[in-house]
């Protein structure tokens, strides 16, 4: 069967079993008190567009674990819902409403993945002007895509975050947080969208999930402009301690600057900086009294807060949209400043353009103010020269800056004349001078982002102070300490290397805005003008999964879901009879919801991508700790890295995104699952490569053919008691044990490697050692276990093959295969490895012999040699070993042979030989004679060492346990 035909057949098999699973509702668990439960969740997807294979990696791993736990006898709940709140969906809807061609065409292409009729596509696009229609359309399509990938989801519990019943739940959550004093109101610096005029969170900012946006606190320092009354150029810095080494100011000649009257002074900043200042001081009045280009400032003189006179010079690296758009130069410790100064010194023509005397610039020299052990001279200059940087536009200057700052921050000491700062560490001096500048009104705090950022509608994001902003205060001491302690001591995080990042994120979190004036979502119950933002309303929704289906079953209305209902259901507070009377919810329904929650909670495993560590997962932990009793706190978090394609990050602009819909149409669910699970460890970026995918298709074809042939073919009666039979059964059960352990520890790639690929390699080897008929019989023997063990990763194909075996029950509901530990036999595995090593050794010798021999004697070591190894392992003295063996076995005159064994096993440990019965070794080589002959082209004879010596076979005495000597002739 050709690959294309095989994939078509496989897709039909997948559709068949998806339909059967859905028809029989086999993934809709009920409470079973006598059965252990397992509650696993993955993030509910944001439904503003189709999902791609990067999302698919996370969801597939979640499903593999859900299926595995089900086979292990757990009552598994694996639910799903859809996230629609926030501003991203509204932003898309608005752009479609404005008639933006680019976004309309993109969304038409998305719709066309599911709808083929052009007229229908136009209708759907038109409907997207209502954001809810857009959200619901993609929620339904994601549902389809998840079904097409075979996810074992309980869809009864589905909801979306815009539903009134969910709004009632979030309302209760925020009332609980307020009740505990964790929601506060005040002036707060946030990431703010100039387009929408409101705070924006990570979910609302382009690429913020993979490239986080952080607010940095600059110190804006005032430099008095000579010749002007009460006027200051303001330069912002992250390193105010370097003010002692300032040599000049930098401005961008072509940038626009403004003179602004503010707080009784005139300050000069870039036009872009003024907008930021106005938003960071919203109650202050700013009056523009002058405008100029940067070139008009070049050549002017200023006085620093330390009293030093400095000149203003031109620099192209200055970004008017970064901080104040003015930079003070400290070339001793700032690589950008050092390179710009060196360039300018060589460019007299440029200086002449601005009327600056080149001699003045040539006299400017870096001032060393920080001493770092091992650094002689100016730190920035040394690093720049080592890296070979000569241009202020060299992107490596970013790394050079990091190197200098890192070394100075941890090792640097101030060597300035000022006794107040002399001898301080860089970190101490930084804080001290900052406080002094602010106290003396020689500077102020300026907030800036760590990178350029835009909302999903294209609005520019800045740092702004919101007056009366509602925020969740993650800095509350008891809350933060409880979260850190729980993660550190109780919570399991896999891969374990991310535990530190998780703890760091919890430690770093402080006050975070939790509401805004715009967007889909739940109104803040105590201030309805505000809408709860999308990361804050998605922290404990796992609890809602436990009751969502019951709310629908009992036709409970949103207005009936008063806070006391959730108090009872989730916390056990209140009298259910009184609550029933007050809300009109039947008592039975309340008790059923309480029972359902108590059975399923806590979350046993939360699986997601590493991008969620700094936000969603931190909030997930914090909010559970705040609201629920300890017994209901989540037990485990597991994570995976991202997916790229052919070595490149996937992006719409590159056109290299593979959507989940493409998997269903062009590939296959089981192909995708096997590849995505087996291509990389969880903590490794997975690189989707088509050539590798092609190889996986071949492997699936081979697996199917192996199973089909074993089922369709009758075989004779075999006792399976040969060494090679024992080897295969040992190998299979060992792989099954290792794969089970791998799944228990979330080592998904190892599980796939062992249970799929390594078992097939073992089958190939067994076939080569025996015959096709014997191989078919052996596969029949292990096939049931093999299918069960592979069901989590390739559920459709294994269900199909299971049905070929005449099985009527769903394989997905079977029990995980029993490991036959008695069959695991180190001895036969070592013997088989020794046979393979012997064949390689013979081949290596054959390659250098001419003419080619036709026969081979294989000499198996005498049993006394094994005894020598035993004595070596016990640590016996060499002379004692020689004496004991010589006397016991009558080897007088053959002491050199004993010494040879001792020497060889001292060089290369022979410990494995202790696992081998010498008679079994002899029998195994004899049994393998035909195989060895086939692989080497030689006639094979096997002898005991003593027999070989009697026949005068050369080098017979050189044989060792598991390392037989051989003679070719």
Swiss-Prot record:
Gene3D superfamilies: Class I aminoacyl-tRNA synthetases (RS), HUPs, Isoleucyl-tRNA Synthetase, Domain 1, leucyl-tRNA synthetase, Valyl/Leucyl/Isoleucyl-tRNA synthetase, editing domain. One of its GO terms (cellular component) is cytoplasm. It is found in: Cytoplasm. It comes from the Archaea. A motif ('HIGH' region) lies at residues 45-55. One of its GO terms (biological process) is leucyl-tRNA aminoacylation. It catalyses: tRNA(Leu) + L-leucine + ATP = L-leucyl-tRNA(Leu) + AMP + diphosphate. Keywords: Aminoacyl-tRNA synthetase, ATP-binding, Cytoplasm, Ligase, Nucleotide-binding, Protein biosynthesis. One of its GO terms (molecular function) is leucine-tRNA ligase activity. It is an enzyme of class 6 (ligase). NCBIfam families: leuS_arch, PRK12300.1. Belongs to the class-I aminoacyl-tRNA synthetase family. This is Leucine--tRNA ligase. The lineage of its organism: Archaea, Thermoproteota, Thermoprotei, Desulfurococcales, Desulfurococcaceae.
């Amino acid at each position: 069967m050709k690959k294309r035909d095989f994939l078509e057949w496989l897709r039909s098999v997948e559709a068949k079993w998806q339909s059967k699973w859905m028809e029989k509702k086999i993934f809709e668990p009920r409470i079973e008190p006598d059965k252990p439960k397992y509650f696993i969740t993955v993030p509910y997807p944001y439904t503003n567009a189709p999902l791609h294979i990067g999302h698919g990696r996370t969801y597939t791993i979640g499903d593999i674990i859900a299926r595995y736990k089900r086979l292990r006898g757990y009552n598994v709940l694996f639910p799903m819902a859809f996230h629609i709140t926030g501003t991203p969906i509204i932003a898309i809807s608005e752009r479609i409403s404005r008639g933006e061609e680019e976004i309309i065409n993109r969304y038409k292409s998305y719709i066309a993945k599911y709808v083929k009729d052009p007229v229908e596509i136009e209708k759907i696009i038109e409907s997207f002007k209502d954001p809810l229609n857009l959200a619901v359309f993609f929620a339904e399509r994601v549902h389809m895509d998840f079904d097409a990938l075979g996810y074992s989801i309980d869809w009864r519990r589905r909801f979306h975050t815009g539903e009134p019943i969910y709004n009632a739940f979030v309302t209760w959550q925020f009332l609980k947080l307020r009740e505990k004093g964790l929601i506060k109101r005040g002036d707060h610096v946030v990431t703010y969208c100039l387009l929408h005029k409101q705070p924006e969170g990570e979910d609302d900012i382009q690429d913020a999930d993979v490239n986080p946006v952080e607010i940095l606190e600059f110190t804006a320092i005032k430099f008095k402009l000579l010749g002007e009354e009460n006027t200051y150029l303001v330069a912002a810095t992250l390193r105010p301690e370097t003010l002692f080494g300032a040599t000049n100011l930098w401005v961008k000649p072509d940038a626009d600057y403004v003179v602004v009257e503010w707080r009784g002074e005139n300050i000069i900043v870039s036009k872009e900086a003024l907008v930021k200042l106005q938003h960071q001081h919203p109650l202050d009045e700013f009056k523009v009294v002058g405008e100029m280009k940067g070139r008009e400032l070049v050549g002017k003189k200023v006085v620093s807060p330390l009293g030093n006179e400095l000149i203003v010079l031109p620099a192209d690296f200055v970004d008017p949209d970064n901080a104040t758009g003015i930079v003070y130069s400290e070339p001793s410790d700032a690589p950008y400043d050092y390179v710009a100064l060196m360039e300018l010194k060589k460019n007299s023509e440029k200086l002449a353009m601005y009327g600056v005397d080149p001699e003045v610039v040539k006299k400017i020299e870096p001032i060393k103010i920080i001493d770092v052990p091992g650094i002689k001279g100016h730190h920035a200059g040394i690093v720049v020269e080592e890296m070979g940087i000569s241009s202020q536009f060299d992107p490596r200057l970013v790394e050079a800056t990091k190197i200098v700052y890192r070394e100075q921050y941890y090792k640097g000491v101030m060597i300035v004349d000022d006794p107040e700062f002399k001898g301080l560490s860089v970190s101490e001096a930084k804080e001290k001078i900052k406080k002094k500048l602010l106290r003396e009104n020689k500077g102020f705090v300026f907030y800036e982002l760590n990178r350029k950022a835009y909302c999903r509608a294209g609005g520019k994001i800045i740092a702004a102070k919101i007056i009366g902003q509602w925020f969740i205060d993650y800095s509350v001491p008891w809350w933060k300490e409880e979260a850190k302690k729980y993660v550190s001591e109780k919570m399991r995080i896999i891969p374990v290397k991310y535990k530190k990042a998780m703890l760091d994120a919890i430690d770093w979190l402080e006050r975070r805005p939790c509401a805004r004036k715009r967007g889909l979502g739940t109104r803040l119950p105590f201030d309805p003008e505000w809408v709860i933002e999308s990361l804050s309303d998605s922290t404990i929704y796992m609890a809602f999964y436990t009751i969502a289906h019951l709310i629908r079953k009992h036709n409970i209305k949103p207005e009936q879901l008063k806070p006391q209902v959730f108090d009872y259901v989730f916390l056990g507070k209140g009298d259910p009879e009184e609550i029933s009377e007050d809300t009109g919810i039947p008592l039975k329904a309340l008790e059923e919801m309480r029972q359902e929650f108590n059975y399923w909670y806590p979350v046993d495993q939360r699986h997601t991508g590493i991008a969620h560590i700094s936000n969603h997962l931190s909030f997930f932990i914090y909010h559970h700790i705040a609201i629920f009793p300890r017994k209901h706190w989540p037990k485990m978090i597991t994570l995976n890295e991202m997916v790229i394609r052919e070595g490149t990050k996937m992006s719409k602009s590159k056109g290299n995104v593979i959507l989940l819909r493409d998997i269903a149409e062009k590939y296959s669910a089981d192909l995708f699952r096997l590849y995505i699970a087996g291509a990389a460890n969880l903590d490794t970026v997975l690189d989707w490569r088509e050539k590798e995918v092609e190889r996986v298709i071949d492997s699936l074809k081979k697996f199917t053919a192996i199973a089909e042939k074993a089922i369709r073919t009758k075989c004779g009666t075999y006792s399976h008691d040969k060494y090679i039979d024992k080897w295969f059964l040992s190998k299979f059960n060992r792989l099954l044990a290792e794969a089970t352990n791998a799944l228990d520890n979330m080592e998904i790639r190892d599980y796939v490697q062992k249970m799929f690929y390594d078992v097939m390699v073992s089958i190939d080897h067994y076939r080569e050692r025996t015959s096709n008929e014997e191989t078919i019989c052996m596969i029949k023997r292990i096939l049931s276990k093999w299918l069960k063990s592979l069901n989590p990763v390739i559920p459709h194909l294994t269900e199909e093959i299971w049905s070929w075996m005449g099985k009527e029950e769903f394989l997905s509901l079977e029990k995980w295969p029993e490991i036959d530990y008695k069959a695991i036999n180190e001895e036969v595995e070592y013997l088989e490895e020794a046979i393979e090593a012997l064949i390689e050794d013979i081949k290596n010798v054959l390659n250098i012999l001419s003419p080619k021999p036709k026969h081979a004697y294989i000499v198996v070591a005498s049993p006394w040699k094994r005894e020598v190894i035993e004595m070596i392992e016990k640590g016996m003295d060499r002379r004692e070993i020689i004496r004991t063996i010589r006397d016991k076995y009558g080897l007088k005159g053959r002491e050199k042979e004993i010494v040879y064994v001792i020497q060889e096993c001292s060089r290369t440990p022979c410990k494995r030989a202790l696992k081998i019965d010498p008679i079994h070794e002899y029998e195994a080589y004899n049994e393998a004679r035909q195989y060895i002959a086939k692989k080497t082209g030689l006639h094979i004879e096997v002898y005991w060492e003593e027999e070989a010596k009697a026949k005068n076979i050369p080098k017979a005495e050189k044989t060792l346990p598991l390392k037989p000597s051989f003679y070719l002739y």
